[in-house]
Amino acid sequence: MRKLLSVIYYEYVMQLKRIATWGVLAASVVITLLDGFPSEKNLARIEFLLQPSYFIYRSLSFGALIATFGLMFLLSNRMAIDHKTGMKQLIMASPITKLQYIFGKLLGGFIYTYTVFSLFLALNTLVFYVSVPIDIALTDCLVPFSKALIINVLPVSIFISFISVALPAIVDVRLFYVLASVLFILNAASPDSADKMPFYLITSGDLKKLIWQHPKFPYINTDGIQANLLFLIGCGLISAVPLFLRRKLWRND
Amino acid sequence: MYNIELRNISKCYKNGVVALDNISFNVKNGVFGLLGHNGAGKTTLLKALVTVLKPDSGSIKVCGYDLKSQGDEVRKRIGYLPQELSMYPSLSVFDFVNYMAQIKGVYDKNQVNIALQQVEMLEFSKRKIGQLSGGMKRRVGIAQALVGNPEILVLDEPTSGLDPEERVRFRGILSRFAKDDKTIILSTHIIEDVYQVCEELAVLRKGRLFYAGASADLINHVEGKIKVIKIDNENQLFDIQKQAVVISTTYASKGLTVRIVDKNMNFPGAESVSATLEDAYVYCMGGKNDA
Amino acid sequence: MKQIKSELMILGINPILILAFLVVVFTLIAIFAGEMLNLSLIGFEVIFPFIAAIFIGEWGKIKADDNYDMIAAQGKSLISWVLYRSVTVFATVTFFVVLCMAIVFHIRSEIPLQEMILIYLSPAFMLSTLTVLCNLIFTHEHVSTLVCGMIWLLAMLSKSMLRYPMTEYIYLFIRYSGDRNGIWLINKSVIIAICAVIWTGICLVYGKKNR
């Protein structure tokens, strides 16, 4: 167990130490605030911007997609790099099991994604709370923020971290980029709507509607939420399976 | 009792290359050298020894444990430095060695400091791996192998690319480690390293074991046969090559000095010199199976 | 010609297989996707230009190439190497894209073929140019693709910026966003002109020095 925790910890630390991590975080926060900062002009342009839950809801459709796209790239060579640098041989020669190594990589990536994504939301919410021109109770911000951490950030982090760590270890990382770009463009091209949303939306699917709903459309698409959740968690978990099955990945015990 | 016992190890890669062909030898305490050309099978043999690669046939016992059935016990006792190791550039020296220590199940940070002290890297422990020189990186690589005080150290060409000062420092580290009844397997191209620290060695040639035994015995194979001849031109050199194995040729302003193994005593008048390990090795590699 | 042949050999078979795979996928989408989707616009103005940039970033590596120091130290001209490499990758991708366009046109006839080529070229050229610029700056693998990907995604997400005056002249995906004022040809020309300026800068800076 301690070996697994060590792999997770160092995987997490190594990723957080990358300048690119903070670049992606900064870029996505700036982009979100450019769109939804509660300035006079934006408040006039965006109807519900005074509501903290709407601000978080909106952040999830815009900057969050940029953040997840960046994190996906940063996670995509975590296993390939061990092969390239000779670290895999070294690790395989140590008394550590395949399960410990793979789970360590996957969970380290997951905790990293969850941290960065949470920081992204926290920073945006903090800026919103400080800058909004009316008095808002802190709990009004904390409640939707906490909801987002559980309802949205958790499944999205599983999806992004697991597919980004696992798939490039199985297929050419560049094919993975091409496939991911198609998925992200489908996400970016999908307009926001009160109707049932496509299941494949990463940060702006029906799950997001549990945080804020348009007052004119106060119903919940339960099957849409389930499909969205199933897609995110299911794809994440399924993409990890080939790693465990692939014999070439590890020494023959 | 031997610390490592290899019996009839063979490995053939999918492309048909026979990397190891029926290799058998034993290794006892001390520093054991593994010599051979590029592609002779040294790295394959070491990978098999550290359980990273499975041989097609044969058996290996390390510290009495069978590699096939007791791989975990073997891994607990081995420190390994692969031929090519870039490590994680974003981690500090301490963090990297600590990471490897924890993977090995060693959670005492003092052990990390001791390993860094052994390779004289303690003062650089906070420096990032990416900011180290090539020699320092190698020392960190050795530190991660030393951490946890393994019984057996497997080093794959650890001195390649190091300057002479670093190599001397490295030999000192090995000698200190070997003092405590430990076993070190050192694969290298550099005969000088083997000569300085190894009591025993094995020579691989094209996947086959060419020699295994004491360094002194290998030298004895050519003792009394090493001669130095001074000649005037290269035509004479070609004649010599037909009758003896040429170890080295030195060009001077007036002619050439040729160092040879005069196995059949074709040059009785030539000056005899004492044999070195390099003479014996080059003779083995250059030539005849009956050496 | 010899250098292009060498670059093609360095490129290898993997990118060709991936491109062929994409053509097959697009063909299937063209056959089975409903009429609500304008595949020609989203495919050739948005998706394939970024795929071209991914290929330039991943297979047209410059500073991230393991042999960069050797080539920079010994090559006659760094800029010609950069040009040969980037153009080879771009041309290879474009060949498959045009093939895909022909198939999509044959199946769906949404937009004339020559219009599709025009729609594709300017965003592809812009994103590829930015990737080459990143390739010349960053020594780490995948960073160029990451930077360009974020720009691409941001451009896609910032359609609302078109409300500001003049932005429609430089917006990358003008046809996909609706082209309310019918200025797409001007937009494409402006973007290509910006690319030409960037390339002139690259040639001036890297043409003089070898590293």
Where are these regions (language model features)?
Chain C
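Aromatic-anchored segments of alpha-helical transmembrane domains
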Residues: 23-31, 94-102, 149-160
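Terminal transmembrane helical anchor/hairpin motif
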Residues: 144-211
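Hydrophobic alpha-helical transmembrane segments that constitute the membrane-spanning cores
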Residues: 83-109
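Hydrophobic alpha-helical transmembrane segments of polytopic membrane proteins
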Residues: 115-141, 194-200
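Long, hydrophobic alpha-helical segments
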Residues: 40-63
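Helix-loop-helix units of permease transmembrane domains in multi-pass membrane transporters
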Residues: 57-90
